[in-house]
Amino acid sequence: MSYPQGYLYQAPGSLALYSCPAYGASALAAPRSEELARSASGSAFSPYPGSAAFTAQAATGFGSPLQYSADAAAAAAAGFPSYVGSPYDTHTTGMTGAISYHPYGSAAYPYQLNDPAYRKNATRDATATLKAWLNEHRKNPYPTKGEKIMLAIITKMTLTQVSTWFANARRRLKKENKMTWAPRNKSEDEDEDEGDASRSKEESSDKAQDGTETSAEDEGISLHVDSLTDHSCSAESDGEKLPCRAGDALCESGSECKDKFEDLEDEEDEEDECERDLAPPKPVTSSPLTGVEAPLLSPAPEAAPRGGSGGKTPLGSRTSPGAPPPASKPKLWSLAEIATSDLKQPSLGPGCGPPGLPAAAAPASTGAPPGGSPYSASPLLGRHLYYTSPFYGNYTNYGNLNAALQGQGLLRYNTAASSPGETLHAMPKAASDTGKAGSHSLESHYRPPGGGYEPKKDTSEGCAVVGAGVQTYL
């Protein structure tokens, strides 16, 4: 491959390997020959052949420094050691030698731990820098790890030297009674990393106390969330409260909420005893979804007062804060876990109703305003299951889930009211009908269009007979 006369070609390896060590110890110790001078004169930092550093050496033996020949390259490859190779070869052998014999160490931190180049004793400049930092931080003369690294790079000392210097300086100031910082309950001879860890623990405890003070001032839905569930937190104070991770036990405002709701425990004892008699222990998968997440997740803004009234008016819907948490805590609020856990535990027990009445009837009977949501919110499912569930059996594997939820009266398909003034909302009679139906609820029924409530439960068809006509769902 030929290049023009004035083209200074260098391989990519030669630019990185021969430009910097040209003035290093290895290059100065070796005999200065024509090929070494010419490769250095053609480097990136001295591209001109007439540069002052190499004029005397480069002019001998060649008519011009730019007369490149193949025999000169072969002679250079044969006659020089591996770390000073020809700029024309691929540097497969010269690369490792040059990297291992680099006289400057790494670029990030030039003085390594076992490198003999770092200073064993601190100079006046280094101690002046450390003293300046100490004078600026007299109230807290404990540098962090990042500050120690910064000071070590500036003063060209190691981290051990910097830590030892600060420990000695603090001990010296303590002996001279010039302490301007709060003493620590530990000896100064211990490692400084432990001091950093204890200081970070103190800062985290202060932040936790500040967080509890601010979270105690939170108002609105956080009080109801903490009273209803055992592990939900008040994230912000503007009304949008998010549920915690399932692994967290209680959030910061849980203790204050327990204190505030202790006066309600006496009133709730009777309802809680009735709940324990009627219903099995409630699963965790259904606790944060009753009356709390439904108003937050409802698409219509009118559904919020109905869900809020369902969470506020009956005292039985609140579990006492002192109740022991259940043993199983799933990590995800998945639909499958809700279905599998609630099949064996059908009733949540929001009030002292009859055992045959399903859990869906009580939140619906707590009072839905006429302008409420057109679709009822299930107490076990926080999100609205509108009308897509009849087709789960056709397209997905949710057929068993659909049948099970319909058997409990959790999926209700309401009809259009006879009078135009009424709106579509959850009816207790429909819920009780579906609950009393039992095993017959899985059969397909047909009633005349003038009839009342028609729960369409046939999952094999593409439309449901609702009210006065046929409405297609696809």
Swiss-Prot record:
Q: Give the span(s) annotated as Disordered.
A: 177-220, 262-373, 420-461
Matching PROSITE patterns: HOMEOBOX_1, HOMEOBOX_2
SUPFAM superfamilies hit by this protein: Homeodomain-like (SSF46689)
Tissue expression from the record: Expressed in specific and overlapping patterns with Irx1 and Irx3 in the developing and adult metanephric kidney. In the adult metanephros, renal expression is found in the loop of Henle in the S3 proximal tubule segment and in the thick ascending limb (TAL) of the distal tubule.
Q: Name one Pfam family in it.
A: Homeobox_KN
Q: Write out the biased-composition intervals (Basic and acidic residues).
A: 196-210
Carrying Phosphoserine, the residues are S187
Protein name per the record: Iroquois-class homeodomain protein IRX-2
Q: Which organism is the protein's source?
A: Mus musculus (Mouse)
Tell me the gene name: Irx2
